[in-house]
Amino acid sequence: MPSTCLVTVETQDPQVIPCTLSSPSFVLMAVISESLSISQSNPQSSIISLIESAVTSLSYVTWHSLVTKLISHFVTPFKARNCVLIVLVQALHVIPCTASITSLISF
């Protein structure tokens, strides 16, 4: 059974709802891995735009259902996008960025 990563988001931003997300850690690692890959060709990009690009990229490939589940934890699409980005930014600090997407598929 895959390990899970529990991340709680609390913010004063009125556009982001406080939430707790528990999802397979390999989903977050895949997004982070993709973010790092994108940053190779776009070194000037901000971390938010990198993660956003990664989520978009992954959601149109084999990770679609996993990313969809990640986002479905939140109440409204408008707030979900912001909250997911914050969760992923926080995840950067707690999950090792060593795995590649290829190796994660075997989980």
UniProtKB/Swiss-Prot annotation:
Superkingdom, taxonomy of origin: Eukaryota
Keyword Transmembrane helix among record annotations: yes
TM stretches of this protein: 16-36, 47-67, 85-105
Membrane topology, as annotated: Multi-pass membrane protein
Cellular component GO terms held in the UniProt record: membrane
Keywords, in A-Z order: Membrane, Transmembrane, Transmembrane helix
Additional observations: Overlaps CCC2.
Name listed for the protein in its UniProt record: Putative uncharacterized protein YDR269C
Taxonomy of the source species: Eukaryota, Fungi, Dikarya, Ascomycota, Saccharomycotina
